[in-house]
């Protein structure tokens, strides 16, 4: 199992894209757990970054979409992020979004563990319903990443986690009923989260994974919005 985990990290170390973190290696120096070594990002993560009200989240979403498209369509085999959310997107020195903190399932399932503050508490808000339900459909996939992308879009435009202010149990219950987040109605958020952006969210939240847009299509939509 550990050898398989190391192979997965090795695969991630081969990823080369401006919107995907460069994996330099792994270490067990911190509490004996397996941690990924990567370049330090001075600007922190996207969730904290957009708390600065002068930041336009649109270009960040463009970068996230570009990173996901690279992962989902790479020639060496598709890679699924599996844990996309604002706190797992870092901001480079030039202000670009960089996908980080992949959910490396082999590492998580091994005797080692990946430690991420708040992972168990908040990931549910971004997770596709088929993942929450488990079973055959409960695997990482491009479709599940697209659902999480829509939630991350909402997060960065509202500067709040999806389904705010509902508790974990309330979120799980709402999703089980086929309900997605309500559209914000406050003037400040609406000035950023226009009809085009909101429609993009809604399409990503289709409860049928096969009816969600591909990230390539989402990227094309965002490029048109950004023009």
Go through each PLM region and give its residues.
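Catalytic-loop of the protein kinase fold
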Residues: 72, 76-91
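A conserved short helix/loop substructure at the end of the activation segment
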Residues: 205-217
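Short beta-strand micro-motifs within the conserved protein kinase catalytic domain, predominantly
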Residues: 22-34
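Conserved short submotifs of the Hanks-type protein kinase catalytic core
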Residues: 31-45
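Regulatory alphaC helix of protein kinase catalytic domains
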Residues: 5, 9-10
């Amino acid at each position: 199992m550990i050898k398989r985990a190391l192979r997965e990290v090795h695969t991630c170390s081969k990823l080369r894209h401006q919107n995907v973190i460069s994996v330099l290696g792994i270490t067990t120096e911190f509490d004996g757990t397996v941690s990924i070594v990567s370049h330090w990002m001075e600007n922190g993560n996207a969730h904290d970054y957009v708390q600065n009200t002068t930041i336009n989240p649109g270009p960040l979403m463009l970068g996230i979409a570009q990173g996901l498209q690279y992962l989902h369509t790479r020639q060496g085999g598709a890679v699924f992020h599996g844990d996309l959310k604002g706190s797992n997107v870092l901001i480079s020195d030039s202000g670009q979004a960089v996908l980080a903190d992949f959910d490396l399932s082999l590492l998580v399932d091994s005797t080692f563990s990946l430690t991420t503050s708040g992972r168990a508490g908040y990931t549910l808000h971004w997770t596709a319903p088929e993942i929450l339900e488990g079973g055959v459909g409960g695997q990482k996939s491009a479709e599940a990443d697209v659902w999480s992308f829509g939630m991350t879009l909402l997060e960065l435009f509202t500067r709040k986690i999806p389904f705010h202010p509902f508790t974990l149990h309330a979120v799980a219950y709402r999703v089980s009923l086929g309900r997605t987040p309500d559209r914000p109605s406050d003037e400040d958020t609406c000035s950023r989260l226009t009809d085009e952006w909101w429609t993009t969210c809604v399409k990503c939240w289709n409860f049928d994974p096969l009816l969600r847009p591909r990230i390539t299509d989402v990227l094309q939509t965002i490029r048109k919005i950004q023009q």
